[in-house]
From Swiss-Prot:
SUPFAM superfamilies per record: CutC-like
Domain of life: Bacteria
Broad class of where this protein is predominantly found: cytoplasm
Molecular functions per Gene Ontology: copper ion binding
Assigned protein family: Belongs to the CutC family.
Pfam family, one: CutC
Protein name, entry field: PF03932 family protein CutC
Keyword ATP-binding: no
Gene (UniProt): cutC
Subcellular location: Cytoplasm
InterPro entries: CutC-like (IPR005627), CutC-like_dom_sf (IPR036822)
UniProtKB keywords: Cytoplasm
Any single Gene Ontology cellular-component annotation: cytoplasm
Length: 248
């Protein structure tokens, strides 16, 4: 059966996803940045409260995936901490200036990962050549690649996703970015064994007093009195749709 990974931005949301039948959690902070390394407090709660596999992301900042020396030192420390806390897997990715896999740095992070399964995240979608990248990640021992098929969303990337799935001699190709109830069957149809979704809904703030004219974000369009959370009902339906493939 195709596995369902849910991207969660809090332990509370991860617990909802677990209860709804998710197979695995990708744990992140900062949805507006596309996912950053979660705090120590979040990691500690996750390892104590969740029973399904949790893969924290290691991404020290938003923006591109070509990191300074300081950024990379932070990443190494985070990978080591996540390993020592007992997580089953970890998510990261590093590119060089030319958009290729940064092999020396990836080798260091892979070594620090120990026995954890490694997911190479959507830095893959920014790679210069996905076929070369797939071969390099195979040689590195990466367990899976999260990708939209180098498109803005995974449905547009279906042709490349299918090619990568058929070509892979190692890493699991996991579709992510815009995977929803309405299109999940398309990823099953091309043979993928894992999909990734946020399955989210907007939660309104419980605050009744709202200070006018003051925001914390540099983006004035952001609604700071709402946040994203996993929709357990959506996770249940998606998991049910994946389960049906067992009987087809």
């Amino acid at each position: 059966m195709t596995k369902l990974e849910i991207c969660c931005f809090s332990v509370g949301c991860a617990l909802i996803a677990q209860q709804a039948g998710a197979d695995r959690i990708e744990l992140c902070a900062s949805p507006a940045e596309g996912g950053l390394t979660p705090s120590f407090g979040t990691l500690k709660q996750a390892i104590e409260q969740l029973t399904i596999p949790v893969y924290p992301i290691v991404r020290p900042r938003g923006g591109d995936f070509c990191y300074s020396h300081s950024d990379f030192e932070v990443m190494k420390n985070d990978v080591a901490q996540i390993r020592d806390m007992g997580f089953m897997g970890v998510v990261f990715g590093v590119l060089d200036e030319e958009g290729h896999i940064d092999l020396p740095r990836m080798q260091q992070l892979m070594a620090l990962s120990g026995d954890m399964a490694v997911t190479f995240h959507r830095a893959f979608d920014m790679c210069f050549n996905p076929y070369v990248a797939l071969d390099q990640l195979t040689q590195l021992g990466v367990k899976r690649i999260l990708t939209s098929g180098q498109q803005q969303n995974a449905e547009l990337g279906l042709p490349l996703l299918k090619e990568l799935h058929q070509a892979s001699q190692g890493p699991i190709i996991m579709a992510g970015a815009g995977v929803r109830m309405s299109n999940i069957h398309k990823f099953i149809d091309i043979g993928l064994t894992e999909v990734h979704s946020s399955a989210s809904r907007i939660m309104l703030s419980t605050m009744t007093y709202r200070k006018a004219g003051v925001t914390m974000s540099a983006d004035n369009e952001v609604d700071e009195f709402s946040h994203y959370c996993v929709d357990g009902g959506v996770v249940e339906v998606m998991k049910g749709m994946l389960s049906l493939t067992l009987f087809e």
